[in-house]
């Protein structure tokens, strides 16, 4: 792995920090509560963006994901009507938002396995998380391809 992949402020660093934070909790009930707390800390999401155009399909709950920026730095705003999914959004945004499109596309969501999330999410939440990541990476791929 090259140095930039693990430099402070990188997606890899964000994933490492998430794994360290979740290591503090021994019970999954504590981890779920932490996820809910993270979701509550998301910035307000504009009602005008809660449209079909920004909706992530494949999620059981309602999820919206809005990209902005360009290939040099992409920002994402997102929201859900579910408390736990909002926490998942907070983790995803921490890893992927405000990064270059190329880094977003190249970054695998290793934190999901690292914190044991994969085996504790229901199949519908796992599918929704995969759909959200696919949509986010799709936006980044499009931005990187257009050179915006």
Question: Model segments located where?
Answer:
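Amphipathic alpha-helical interface surfaces
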Residues: 31, 61, 84-89, 100, ...
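Conserved interaction-surface patches within small, structured recognition/assembly domains
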Residues: 66-82, 93-96
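Extended low-complexity intrinsically disordered regions
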Residues: 9-48
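Intrinsically disordered, low-complexity regions enriched in acidic/Ser/Thr/Pro/Gln residues
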Residues: 2-6
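C-terminal binding/interaction regions
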Residues: 80, 102, 107, 111-148
């Amino acid at each position: 792995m090259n140095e930039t992949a693990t430099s402070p402020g990188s997606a890899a660093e964000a994933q490492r920090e998430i794994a360290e934070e979740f290591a503090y909790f021994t019970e999954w009930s504590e981890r779920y509560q932490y996820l809910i707390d993270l979701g509550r800390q998301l910035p307000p999401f504009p009602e005008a963006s809660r449209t079909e155009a920004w909706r992530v399909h494949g999620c059981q709950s309602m999820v919206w994901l809005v990209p902005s920026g360009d290939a040099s730095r992409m920002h994402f705003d997102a929201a859900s009507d579910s408390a736990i999914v909002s926490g998942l959004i907070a983790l995803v945004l921490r890893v992927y938002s405000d990064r270059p499109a190329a880094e977003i596309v190249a970054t695998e969501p290793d934190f999901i396995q690292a914190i044991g999330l994969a085996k504790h999410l229901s199949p519908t939440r796992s599918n929704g998380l995969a759909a959200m990541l696919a949509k986010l990476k799709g936006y980044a791929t499009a931005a990187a391809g257009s050179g915006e």
